[in-house]
């Protein structure tokens, strides 16, 4: 069975005739029969059989999809649900590992056969790789069945997570790998890795465009997330819900997406920012409408962050279901660039994420069904109420022919194209970086793919000119 995680990487596209995908699947880095080493093939490995000392497996792969979210490459956050590989043990783990971009370490790992590298006539050039330092305070593995079983990770001296073609150390594909010291405990017994290279936790993954998050247009149509009775006991569904009766929302609490308006979310490839533009109509009084233009930046949740889980426990991987919250992407609101406006001109002033809960996006993230969607909880200003907020629950579908016409709103004081200089708690500063090299298909080199895309672009321009 092909095991996957997802790498969400918003890439800067500079001087290129094409746009790379903003999301990548990450699968276990399988051994290349010609250029690979003699051992490996799993996504995460405790070397020297250290895992068995506290009754956990030594080798793990992802159950379904995880997410590494980035604002353009400065920070990466790898999340996923791990299951033992080739072991009688069944204990699954929730993984969150955070990284920050760093300089080239003194110990760049070259695990492939010598002939794989450009210095010996091969195709793998380590000078093109990017490197990331682990953030221990935001990195943790926790057992889904025994929360007392916890693994923390820290930097292994002179090394870093390396990302690029051949960087996974197992094959010639685009990927990532890293070696980290760790401390593991099951609540009563603790083990800690030594400084030796044989006593580390090892991550080895392939990277490739995601069939789930990758939308060529970077634009998604949104609609009300209808309740799936097999997954939730909730009774009411709506696209927008106001928690208290508020004059700001015309004393209406339940809204559906408006017909006749463009209701979309769009992704900025240069920094990973998300923009939600939609119209909402009161379900009980169709004369009252609200148009919203909301801006978000990728968030960096802590290792202990708990997403909002509104479905039955049995719907989630931890309860035996198929929905994995570790596959979701998270965003924090940019209040200076966000606003909602009622059709009578009343402006809804957004003040932040309600109770520090981030916008969550992915399969089942809307809290109403198992579809690909999102939910978000936002505080707003109403002097007559205490801690007022509204939440949005919608399905999202890739738009093949997106429109750029968003619902009209009162323009905010500032229209930023990137997060503010001082981000809200959890916000990642937007720092565009050089593109990660795209994975070549089997039998093709990265350079041949680039040449093919350039040829296609030139032919397209020729055809347009000829028929003009």
Curated annotation (Swiss-Prot):
Lipid conjugation (GPI-like-anchor amidated asparagine) is at 444
Q: List the propeptide region positions.
A: 445-468
Q: Where in the cell is it found?
A: Cell membrane
Alphabetic keyword roster:
Cell membrane, Glycoprotein, GPI-anchor, Lipoprotein, Membrane, Signal
Which conditions up-regulate this protein? Down-regulated in grlA null cells at 16 hours of starvation.
Q: Where is this region: Disordered?
A: 401-421
Which spans does this entry mark as compositional bias, Pro residues?
A: 409-421
Q: How does it sit in the membrane?
A: Lipid-anchor; GPI-anchor
Q: Does the keyword Metal-binding apply?
A: no
What is the protein name for this chain? Uncharacterized protein DDB_G0291392
Q: Which organism is it from?
A: Dictyostelium discoideum (Social amoeba)
Q: What does the record give as the organism's lineage?
A: Eukaryota, Amoebozoa, Evosea, Eumycetozoa, Dictyostelia
């Amino acid at each position: 069975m092909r095991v996957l995680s997802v790498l969400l990487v918003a890439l800067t596209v500079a001087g290129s005739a094409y746009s790379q995908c903003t999301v990548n699947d990450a699968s276990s880095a399988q051994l290349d029969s010609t250029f690979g080493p003699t051992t490996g093939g799993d996504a995460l490995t405790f070397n020297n059989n250290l895992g068995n000392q506290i009754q956990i497996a030594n080798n793990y792969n992802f159950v379904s999809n995880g997410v590494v979210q980035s604002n353009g490459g400065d920070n990466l956050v790898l999340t996923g649900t791990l299951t033992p590989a080739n072991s009688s043990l069944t204990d699954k783990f929730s993984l969150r590992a955070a990284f920050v971009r760093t300089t080239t370490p003194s110990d760049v790992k070259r695990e492939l056969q010598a002939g794989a590298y450009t210095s010996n006539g091969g195709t793998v050039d380590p000078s093109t790789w990017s490197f990331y330092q682990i953030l221990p305070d935001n990195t943790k593995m926790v057992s889904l069945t025994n929360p007392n079983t916890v693994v923390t990770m820290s930097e292994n001296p002179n090394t870093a997570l390396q990302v690029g073609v051949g960087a996974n150390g197992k094959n010639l594909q685009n990927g990532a790998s890293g070696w980290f010291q760790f401390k593991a405990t099951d609540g009563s017994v603790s083990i800690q890795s030594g400084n030796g290279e044989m006593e580390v936790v090892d991550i080895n993954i392939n990277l490739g465009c995601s069939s789930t998050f990758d939308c060529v247009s970077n634009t998604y149509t949104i609609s009300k997330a209808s309740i799936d009775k097999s997954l939730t006991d909730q009774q009411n569904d709506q696209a927008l819900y106001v928690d208290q009766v508020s004059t700001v929302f015309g004393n209406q609490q339940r809204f559906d997406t408006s017909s006749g308006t463009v209701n979309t979310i769009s992704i900025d490839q240069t920094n990973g920012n998300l923009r939600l533009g939609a119209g909402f109509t009161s379900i009980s009084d169709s004369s009252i409408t609200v148009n919203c233009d909301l801006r978000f930046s990728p968030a960096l949740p802590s290792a202990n962050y708990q997403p909002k889980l509104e479905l039955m426990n049995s719907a989630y991987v931890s309860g035996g279901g198929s929905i994995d919250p570790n596959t979701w992407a998270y965003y924090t609101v940019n209040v200076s660039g966000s606003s909602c406006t009622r059709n009578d001109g009343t402006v809804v002033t957004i003040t932040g994420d309600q109770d520090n809960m981030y916008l969550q996006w992915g399969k089942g993230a809307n809290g109403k069904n198992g579809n690909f969607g999102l939910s978000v909880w936002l505080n707003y200003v109403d002097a007559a109420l205490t801690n007022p907020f509204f939440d949005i629950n919608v399905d999202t579908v890739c738009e093949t022919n997106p429109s750029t016409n968003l619902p009209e709103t009162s323009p905010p004081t500032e229209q930023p194209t990137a997060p503010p200089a001082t981000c809200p708690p959890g916000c990642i500063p937007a720092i565009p970086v050089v593109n990660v090299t795209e994975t070549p298909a089997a039998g093709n080199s990265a350079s041949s793919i680039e040449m093919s895309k350039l040829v296609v672009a030139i032919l397209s321009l020729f055809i347009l000119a000829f028929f003009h």
